[in-house]
Design a protein with these regions (language model features):
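Secretory targeting signals
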Residues: 1-3, 13-19
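N-terminal export leaders
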Residues: 5-9
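Bacterial lipoprotein signal-peptidase II cleavage site
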Residues: 24-39
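Extracytoplasmic substrate-binding proteins
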Residues: 58, 148-151, 155-221, 316-351
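Basic- and aromatic-lined ligand-binding clefts that recognize polyanionic substrates
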Residues: 67-82, 189-248
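A short, structured surface patch at a secondary-structure boundary
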Residues: 75-128
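Proline-aspartate-enriched helix->loop->beta-strand connector
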Residues: 133-139, 157, 271-272
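Structured C-terminal subdomain patch of bacterial secreted/periplasmic proteins
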Residues: 270-351
Length: 351
């Protein structure tokens, strides 16, 4: 049985980042008094009112928002790309001291205050959101429940939830970006940004024809094995680069987000063309079992660990800002894994 998506995401990030959190000490960044005063970028003509359809109905936004709160895990990147600094963002993983603004987005923050950091281990922090006095709440890369949506809406603020067209945490990066652009009155600029990133991905795919048709899977050693499904952004990016997801995931029932397997089935990964691990060493039993597979012996694997710093975070974020940052490091690793030479070992990614 699959773990719940929210529990899985929280579990993996907690497992991987315990040393980081311990080093950071207590979190003093979460009070509303530390929040920025909000920002408003120029909007496009006739951008408002705009109505956005989502999992729980329709939301109409009447005017350009000035105080945006992100209750999903990655929306801040596109907001920053559009010149908007959110007043609150939801912490997922990575260096907590960055308050949700990572190296690929740092320049866009400018002199603005960092957003207030919200937590989501037990669901959306409704009181903390209310304390930030938002005029727009966005949760596209999320598992927002209907009850949470209703409580947020009861604050008298427009709320944009995740799409009903995909699994929770399954919205494609480009669709999320375009939705955010529409919500803040910059649909044309959002389209430009998306097209630039699509072109970069296509450029990498064209430069690496060996990726075409190669089977791949993204795997985490979580309570045995967790293999990310076709609607997960990490898997989507692999397919955009030309890979095909392995039948181990595509043939499984209820696999949109991913599937759980026992650690004993690690041997099943052996015939996958390229295995992309997220912190393989986190489970020694799984690591030892994988070392006995043809995929390991032939170097057909990549391991992205928390020691890789922001690159590790970028691999999971998959946003218009993080994708170019990721591809600079990710593509050489993938190319080494699929070059057909068992002697080639995937290069270590720079943090």
């Amino acid at each position: 049985m699959n773990p719940t998506r929210r529990r899985f995401l929280a579990g993996v990030s907690a497992m991987a980042l315990a040393p980081v959190l311990a080093a950071c000490g207590g979190d003093d960044s979460g009070s509303a008094s530390d929040a920025s005063s909000g920002s408003q970028a120029p909007t496009e003509e006739s951008a408002f009112p705009v109505t956005i359809t989502h999992k729980y109905g329709e939301t109409t936004i009447e005017a350009a928002p000035k105080r945006v709160v992100c209750v999903g895990l990655t929306e801040q990147d596109m907001l920053l790309a559009l010149g908007i600094v959110p007043v609150g963002v939801t912490y997922w993983f990575g260096d907590e001291a960055l308050q949700g603004v990572y190296p690929w987005a740092e320049e866009l923050l400018g002199d603005a205050e960092r957003p207030t950091l919200l937590k989501n281990a037990n669901g959306i922090e409704l009181e903390a959101v209310a304390a930030l006095a938002p005029d727009l709440v966005i949760g596209l890369y999320s598992s927002m429940t209907e009850a949470e949506y209703k409580k947020l809406s009861a604050m008298g603020v427009p709320v944009v939830a995740q799409s009903s067209d995909y699994a929770d945490f399954g919205v494609p990066w480009d669709e999320a970006a375009l939705t955010i652009g529409a919500a803040v009155g910059q649909p044309a600029r959002a389209e430009e940004i998306v097209e630039e990133v699509r072109a970069r991905i296509a450029e990498e795919a064209e430069a690496h024809p060996e990726f075409q048709g190669e089977t791949a899977a993204v795997v985490a050693p979580y309570e045995g094995l967790f293999i990310y499904g076709p609607e997960d952004p990490r898997s989507r990016l692999l397919t955009e680069l030309g890979f095909d997801l392995h039948e181990l995931i595509t043939s499984a029932e209820d696999s949109d987000f991913g599937i759980s397997l026992s650690s004993e089935r690690t041997s099943d990964l052996g015939d996958i063309g390229t295995v992309v691990w997220i912190d393989l060493a986190a489970d020694k039993q799984v690591e030892q079992l994988f070392e006995r597979t043809p995929a390991y012996e032939e170097g057909r694997w990549v391991d992205i660990t928390d020691a890789d710093g922001s690159y590790y975070v970028a691999h999971s974020f998959v946003t218009p800002l993080s994708i170019p940052y990721l591809l600079d490091r990710y593509v050489p690793q993938l190319a080494a894994a699929v070059d057909g030479d068992p002697a080639t070992k995937p290069p270590k990614a720079a943090a």
